[in-house]
């Protein structure tokens, strides 16, 4: 990756979203990422498509969308079971493109669970446009420690 990722990137974000505190490793490379807890206790994760996220056509790269879908869908397990998880399989359908400046959102819902294997379905969208649909198979691992209050 390039040093331009170190530059401060502070887009204007929609109301209710907070920046996720993933400042190291992979999250740093693809972020910044945002999260909102909705009134019904569901969640939405999001990012603003910037130049580092794009392909040669200046649209959001499919790999970025797949990585984001992984984090958006897998978070359903974190909320449901308070456990770490790994992705076993992810099936995605690309429906539309996201351009630089698009606010991309995503969420997932648990469709089923057998032992420690979860099936989660989800959608990635921008405004009213569906960008991607996905179904993920995830394996739940150990219990997550409580979040530290800062």
Question: What is each model feature region?
Answer:
Residues 1-150:
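Terminal targeting signals and extreme-terminal segments of soluble enzymes
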């Amino acid at each position: 990756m390039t040093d331009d990722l170190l530059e401060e990137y502070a887009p204007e974000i929609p109301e209710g979203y907070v920046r996720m505190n993933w400042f190291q490793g992979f999250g740093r490379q693809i972020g910044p990422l945002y999260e909102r807890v909705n009134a019904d206790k569901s969640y939405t994760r999001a990012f603003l498509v910037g130049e580092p996220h794009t392909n040669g056509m200046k649209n959001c790269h499919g790999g970025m969308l797949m990585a984001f879908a992984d984090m958006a869908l897998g978070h359903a397990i974190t909320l449901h079971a308070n456990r770490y998880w790994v992705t076993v399989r992810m099936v995605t359908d690309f429906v539309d493109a996201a351009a630089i400046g698009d606010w991309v959102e995503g969420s997932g819902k648990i469709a089923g669970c057998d032992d420690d294997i979860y099936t989660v379905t989800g959608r990635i969208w921008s405004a009213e446009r569906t960008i991607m649909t996905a179904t993920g198979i995830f394996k739940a691992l150990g219990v997550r420690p409580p979040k530290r209050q800062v």
